[in-house]
From Swiss-Prot:
CDD domains: RecA-like_Lon. This is Lon protease. It catalyses: Hydrolysis of proteins in presence of ATP. HAMAP family: lon_bact. The gene is lon. It holds the Pfam family Lon_lid. Its main location: cytoplasm.
Length: 790
């Protein structure tokens, strides 16, 4: 024992690791000594040592370690004095200590027991006592609130703490009673600057207060909700007892009503079995449970559908009246109206859906939606619209499974339930705007809906039973063919072209102007439009294939005229003319391509089809020294770039015929440009225009700028058919073109072109590229000298 005592000096004392707490100078508290090493360390003090009442204590980082290592102990601890020692019956000891100072420890083991050499670490000198006093007062106020919220700290603590005269001891006492993790408390112990320790303590207390306030708020709300649920449950039970006494039972009445529907509705066998099964479950459920509400909602939807097959004779269509209505509501579109009346005729004769799904494809504003409404009116069927633009979830079509929170049937079933009819016209609007994501592709979900062989057994995920959609007339609309081919294959495509200028004029006179006069509160005698004014609107204030923009402009003029009439007593009416339209709408917004007067070398006029109709497109070319390469610019797509290369390759194969020497096209690069470079351009129909431009450039022969052309060119010089002929010819007429070269393969399309366009143009169908040169160039190419223009 004497040898052990000799190891303990004034600066080396036994070290006692403590768990789950941090000690601060100034505290007086009991400590339980129970671990074997700690008991041995206590006993080694002996009875006669001068250090028997002084020990070192520090916190261990891991509270689960029974025998902590030196590295698992914090190096800042405390020096304490034992004021009382009591041996417990289980050979453990309970000591009462007074913490004296904060110390820095150098820990080691002596005879396998922890000892440490220590250096006292005092607080820094206080420079601004008043500031510290204010900060401490603020900390005490916060801690008082913290005590009220925590409900785990004795409210009398502050009375005891405030009895300290040492500000550092006050901070230490507050920190010791803070309920937080050991690491945060240890950081407070290690701070020697009293001001900084107060600030850190204040931050910790403020954060804990926020956490406790949030927890208290959540607990309060949860308690209120629980009380409300208990109250509702109590009242419901009480109501049940009262109803039983009176002989009234709403729940039984509801179930009886559902059972009656199941018995009387013409449900399919599968649907009836499903309804019976769900009703049986409902009877066994607590009426106020969430599951009961979901089951009742399912039965309401299932039994709310029109299961009874409506009489086939309900379809009664007057074909002549339907055609009259179509003509009254839609100008032009003769082929479209003819196909619609054929469709209606088959419906009238068969008295049932014929399985043909029509799909109207055309630019915005050409009347696709109104055509569908006309079909609904002609068939005397209810009309419903399913907007597919932006739909990206397959569940929008097939519905969600009942296991999902907030599950509902798909839009098709929902529309049928809303209209309560199977004889329904459903417009699938903007079918080309469907998108896809990780939840599936709605476009392919529509395959089952639109397939006549499958839609009689359509199964919505929510219903989980088959439902017959064969009586529903589905009609789709789109702006382009940009949707999956299998879906396109399910439908009959009816293309609706943009309106030509004359058609827009008639639509404006007979539909748009009367509508806007009425909508804006004007009288027919108060405003009038000349034909020239309407044409001015069409040509220079709108650029579209349809008439929506034109209607908006007419509406704008009507509003300004109304304001003018109401603002002046002298003005009773206004006449809108080509000359004064600028006063209402400002300067012209658009300009169309116009033919130039002077023929030029290396410039050809092509014809382009755009979303807003047709337009002239210039093809320019120059030569620069190089290696016989072609460069095409003007924001062109891949197809147009390939068309440029094809035209150049065909020219090279025929260069000798055009009296162009080999050196001329192998020592120069050709730069082909399409002006208005900000506008994207693509497609093969500029092939012959590019070819003509190259020949003109290499031979020096000007191109007639009264001639425009369209057609795809092959490497053999053949001219292939193109699309959008009507719009292109309209653009040629508007631009002052006299002669238009088109592919011979488009000759049959001329039957659909209005005479008002054909009569003003010399339209020449051709099949070979060399034939184009004879018409488009100012002189015959084979007789020209072999000179070039750069």
């Amino acid at each position: 024992m004497a040898q052990v005592l000799n190891d303990i000096s004034n600066r080396v004392l036994p070290l006692f690791p403590i768990r789950n707490t941090v000690l601060f100078p100034g505290l007086v508290l009991p400590i339980l000594i129970g671990r074997d090493d700690s008991v041995k360390n206590l006993l080694r003090l002996g009875n006669d040592s001068e250090n028997q009442h002084t020990i070192l204590l520090t916190t261990q980082k891991n509270a689960d370690d029974i025998k902590p290592s030196i590295n698992s102990l914090y190096k800042i601890g405390v020096l304490a004095k034992i004021t009382e020692l009591v041996q417990l019956p289980n050979d453990n000891y309970k000591i009462l200590i007074k913490v004296l100072d904060r110390v820095k420890l150098t820990i080691r083991r002596s005879h396998d027991l922890l000892v440490a050499e220590y250096v006292i670490v005092p607080d820094d000198e206080i420079n601004n006592a008043d500031e510290i006093k204010d900060k401490l007062a603020n900390a005490i106020v916060l801690f008082n609130k913290y005590i009220r919220l925590s409900k785990k700290i004795n409210p009398d603590l502050l009375v005891h703490v405030l009895s300290y005269t040492n500000q550092s001891y006050v901070v230490n006492a507050l920190a010791a009673n803070l309920i937080c993790n050991v690491a945060n408390k240890q950081s407070l112990l290690e701070i020697t600057d009293v001001k900084q320790r107060i600030e850190r303590l204040t931050d910790h207390v403020a954060k804990e207060i926020i956490i406790m306030e949030t927890d208290e708020l959540i607990t309060s709300k949860a308690q209120k909700n629980l009380e409300k649920m208990q109250r509702d449950c109590f009242l419901n039970e009480k109501m049940k007892i009262i109803k039983n006494v009176l002989g009234v039972d709403d729940e039984k009445s509801d179930i009886a009503e559902l059972q009656k529907k199941i018995d009387t509705l013409h449900l399919s066998k599968e649907a009836k079995a499903k309804a019976e099964s769900e009703l049986k479950k409902l009877k066994m459920m607590n009426p106020i449970s969430a599951e009961a509400a979901l089951t009742r909602n399912y039965l309401d939807i299932l039994l709310g559908l029109p299961w009874k097959k409506e009489k086939e004779s309900k379809i009664n269509i007057n074909i002549d009246k339907a055609l009259q209505d179509l003509n009254a509501d839609h100008h032009g579109l003769e082929k479209v109206k003819e196909r619609i009346t054929e469709y209606l005729a088959v419906l009238q004769r068969t008295k049932k859906s014929i399985g043909t799904i029509l799909c109207f494809i055309g630019p915005p504003g050409v009347g696709k939606t109104s055509l569908v409404k006309s079909i609904a009116e002609a068939t005397k069927c209810k009309y419903a619209k399913f907007a597919l633009g932006g739909v990206r979830d397959e569940a929008e079509i097939r519905g969600h499974r009942k296991t999902y929170i907030g599950a509902m049937p798909g839009k098709i079933i929902s529309l049928i339930k809303r209209e309560n009819s199977n004889n329904l016209v459903i417009l699938l609007d903007e079918i080309d705007k469907i998108s896809r994501d990780s939840r599936g592709d709605p476009a392919f979900a529509l395959l089952e809906v639109l397939d006549p062989e499958q839609n009689s057994r359509f199964q919505d995920n929510y219903l989980e039973v088959e439902y017959d959609l064969s009586k529903v007339l589905f009609i789709a609309t789109a702006n382009s063919f940009n949707f999956p081919i299998p879906l396109r294959d399910r439908m009959e495509i009816i293309q609706i072209p943009g309106y030509v200028e004359g058609e827009k004029l008639e639509i404006a006179k007979h539909h748009l102007i009367p509508k806007q006069i009425k909508n804006n509160g004007l009288k027919n005698t108060e405003i009038s439009f000349s034909d020239e004014a309407i044409l001015e609107l069409i040509r220079y204030y709108t650029r579209e294939a349809g008439v929506r923009g034109l209607e908006r402009k007419i509406g704008g003029i009507c509003r300004k005229v109304l304001k003018k009439i109401l603002s002046s007593k002298d003005i009773k009416s206004e006449s809108v003319s080509k000359e004064n339209i600028k006063d209402y709408l400002g300067s012209r917004k658009y300009k169309y391509g116009l033919a130039e007067d002077d023929n030029q070398v290396g410039i050809t006029i092509g014809l382009a089809y755009t979303e807003t109709g047709g337009d002239l497109i210039w093809v320019e070319a120059v030569m620069i020294p190089g290696k016989g390469k072609v460069k095409a610019t003007g924001k062109l797509g891949d197809v147009m770039k390939e068309s440029s290369q094809t035209a150049f390759s065909y020219f090279c194969s025929r260069a000798q015929k055009y009296n162009v020497k080999y050196e001329q096209y192998h020592k120069y690069d050709i730069h082909i440009h399409f002006p208005e470079g900000a506008i994207p351009k693509d497609g093969p129909s500029a092939g012959i225009a590019i070819f003509t431009t190259i020949v003109s450039l290499m031979t020096g022969i000007p191109v007639k700028l009264s001639v425009a052309m369209t057609g795809e060119i092959t490497l053999r010089g053949r001219i292939l058919p193109i699309g959008g002929l009507k719009e292109k010819l309209m653009a040629a007429k508007r631009g002052g073109i006299k002669t238009v070269i088109i592919p011979e393969g488009n000759t049959s399309d001329l039957e659909d072109i209005p005479n008002s366009i054909k009569n003003d143009l010399d339209i020449i169908p051709l099949s070979e590229a060399d034939q184009v040169l004879d018409i488009a160039l100012a002189t015959t190419v084979t007789n020209s000298p072999a000179e070039t223009a750069c």
